[in-house]
Swiss-Prot record:
CC per GO annotation: chloroplast thylakoid membrane; photosystem II reaction center
GO BP of this protein: photosynthesis
Localization in the cell: Plastid, Chloroplast thylakoid membrane
Pfam families: PsbL
Encoding gene, per UniProt annotation: psbL
Protein's name in the database: Photosystem II reaction center protein L
Keyword Transmembrane helix attached: yes
Length: 38
């Protein structure tokens, strides 16, 4: 079993984790803004 390009898979994984991190930061920013502006 040989993978054609294992580096591509790791890059996709890092990109997905990066998107989840940005989404988490965005949600936390919205929650904090709602908390401070109420």
């Amino acid at each position: 079993m040989t993978q054609p390009n294992p580096n591509k898979q790791s890059v996709e994984l890092n990109r997905t984790s990066l998107y989840w991190g940005l989404l988490l930061i965005f949600v936390l920013a919205v929650l904090f803004s709602n908390y401070f502006f109420n």
